[in-house]
Regions:
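Cell-envelope and extracellular/periplasmic
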Residues: 2-360
Length: 360
């Protein structure tokens, strides 16, 4: 019997990787032989995390202080009602904020907790589904959180290096969330990743787990960074990721979040993922999702293709510009063939033509 190739995937980034659409997923997805990893049992003292074959909920509430979030640490199945999660978590699951479809209203995300949240669609389940449809399997971990800078992922050592090295970059500045940055979230990212890899080795002892890929969709919180500053952060994060055992770094290119200055972040992503060994741009399509209420004639060279329309629930009247299920399914459809090319055919990815005025 041939060895099963089971790459291990980690999905990281901010809200458009986390999943923050208004509409919940249209249906549950049940994988044939792929799994999402949940780390919470480990934090409650269990020997291993758990692997599940259902897509939703996707991700998990990773509270910073367990004793603050839970009345008892005896049972990892207990659910915390601690909300205002941005202040109390390292990472969170995909969150839908639909209040009423009839009047197109949404809830503020801050009111959600582990006990009351509603799942949102997000990229990992659709990518795992499409990966299986092409005859492959995987295991994955969702480690994302909305409204965070790339600095959120740097552990204390890398954060200190970043502060030292960016001091010489013209125009470098403290990011919006910098005052609270300690490296603790980055350290927890390292912890969950290491445990995911170790628990995968225990759960799938006969499988080939040699491919370990980090997927990245982030940048909306860092729009005013100089290209060199974001490029430095990517280089340090990849160094950190390699030390954890990652073999590949995959980018879903960031899009515009109502600030054209993000073009420098996009330039940094293009540069890094074209010149760095083991790092690959999988798709640019996520840069091409129009946003309602904006004059984008100066942003796009030409109108993006029809398939990129209506990829945010704001097009349906909701005050929510996050990517929706259509967007994630389109991103997955673009990523998976390129993943096969890179991982199994030793070929470079085939990317979409450049449609951004500042890059062509």
């Amino acid at each position: 019997m041939s060895t099963v190739k089971r790459p291990l995937f980690v999905f990281a980034g901010q809200s458009n990787m986390e999943g923050g659409a208004a509409y919940p997923p249209s249906e549950q997805i049940r994988f044939s032989d792929s799994y999402e990893y949940l780390h919470k049992p480990r934090r409650f003292g269990e020997e291993r995390g758990v692997f599940k074959k259902t897509a939703y909920p996707a991700g998990e509430f990773s509270y910073e202080k367990l004793e603050e979030a839970y009345s008892s640490l005896d049972d990892f199945r207990s659910l915390s009602s601690l909300d205002t999660f941005f202040e109390h978590t390292f990472f969170v699951p995909a969150l839908s904020n639909l209040k009423s479809e009839a009047d197109k209203s949404v809830y503020p995300f801050e009111g959600y907790s582990e006990a009351n949240f509603v799942p949102s669609p997000c990229l990992p389940p659709y990518l795992a589904r499409d990966w299986e449809a092409r005859g492959h399997v995987c295991a994955y971990a969702h480690i994302a959180k909305g409204a965070v800078s790339i600095e959120h992922y740097l552990n204390p050592e890398m954060l200190a290096r970043f502060d030292r090295e960016r001091a010489s970059i013209p125009g470098a500045h403290d990011a919006r969330y910098r005052p609270a940055m300690t490296g603790a979230a980055g350290a927890y990212f390292d912890e969950k990743t290491r445990d995911f890899f170790a628990d995968s080795e225990a759960r799938f002892p006969g499988d080939d787990l040699s491919v370990r890929a980090l997927f990245w969709l982030q940048g909306e919180s860092d729009p005013n960074w100089p290209q060199a500053e974001y490029l430095l952060a990517l280089r340090l994060f990849w160094e950190q990721a390699r030390s954890l055992g990652f073999t590949h770094f995959f980018c879903i290119r960031v899009g515009n979040w109502r600030d054209d200055a993000i073009i420098n972040v996009i330039r940094a992503q293009e540069q890094f993922f074209s010149e760095t060994e083991g790092a690959y741009m999988l798709t640019r399509v996520s840069s091409y999702f129009p946003m309602p209420g904006r004059d984008e004639s100066g942003w796009f060279i030409e109108t993006p293709p029809a398939e990129t329309q209506n990829c945010r629930d704001s097009w349906f009247g909701f005050a929510n510009d996050h990517y929706n299920q259509k967007a994630f399914e389109l991103i997955s459809a673009r990523c998976v063939p390129n993943m096969e090319r890179i991982l199994y055919e030793n070929k470079p990815p085939v990317l979409e033509p450049e449609l951004l005025r500042g890059l062509r």
